[in-house]
């Protein structure tokens, strides 16, 4: 690896990541393709030092990772070549996990649990926990439901009830047991 000689900012590619859910048509439109279709690439990872982890897609070890535009050089390798120089002394860490993405979902996303770093290491041998924030740019109804986020449990939800809903895979029951927030751009 040779350290880039360009000045800031780095121009990055726009990698798309395969997902189990459908979407992506609006991302195609964002890039001028008015004939785009929803498919299994509904996420554009606009700034990523981490790779997508998808069972059955191990042949794509850098899927989703940002590259310097027009090269096979990952942003991760650039930052690791001089972490302190690029990010400053206070921000330099041995591992840097950053992911900023655009999502265009044509269906409700799966329910997810995001572990903190110690739990991610224990359960998944991953150094990355997951902290999220969202900025809603646009939305459209999905299966007749207006755009929303399910976040946190209803006050009366118990662990035993949630486990029963989970083991029964009672998706409507699980959704009813969560806080629902309408979203607007």
Residues of each region from the PLM?
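Generic detector of well-ordered alpha-helical segments enriched in charged/polar residues
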Residues: 76-80, 163, 172
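Loop-centered beta-sheet repeat module
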Residues: 166-185
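Transition-metal
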Residues: 1-157
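Short, flexible helix-coil linker/hinge segments at the edges of structured domains or between repeats
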Residues: 155-171
């Amino acid at each position: 690896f040779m350290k880039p000689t360009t000045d800031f900012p780095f121009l990055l590619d726009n990698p798309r990541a395969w997902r189990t859910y459908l979407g992506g048509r609006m991302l195609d439109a964002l890039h001028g393709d008015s004939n785009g279709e929803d498919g299994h690439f509904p996420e554009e990872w606009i700034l990523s030092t981490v790779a997508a982890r998808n069972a059955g897609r191990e042949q794509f070890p850098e899927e989703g990772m940002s590259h310097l535009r027009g090269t096979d050089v990952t942003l991760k390798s650039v930052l690791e070549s001089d972490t302190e120089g690029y990010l400053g002394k206070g921000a330099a860490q041995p591992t840097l996990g950053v992911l900023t993405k655009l999502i265009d979902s044509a269906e409700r996303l799966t329910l997810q649990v995001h572990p903190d770093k110690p739990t991610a290491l224990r359960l998944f041998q991953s150094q990355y926990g997951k902290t999220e924030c969202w900025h809603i740019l646009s939305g459209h109804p999905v299966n007749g439901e207006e755009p929303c986020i399910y976040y946190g449990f209803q006050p009366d939800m118990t662990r035993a009830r949630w486990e029963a809903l989970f083991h029964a895979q009672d998706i409507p029951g699980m959704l009813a047991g969560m806080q629902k927030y309408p979203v607007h751009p």
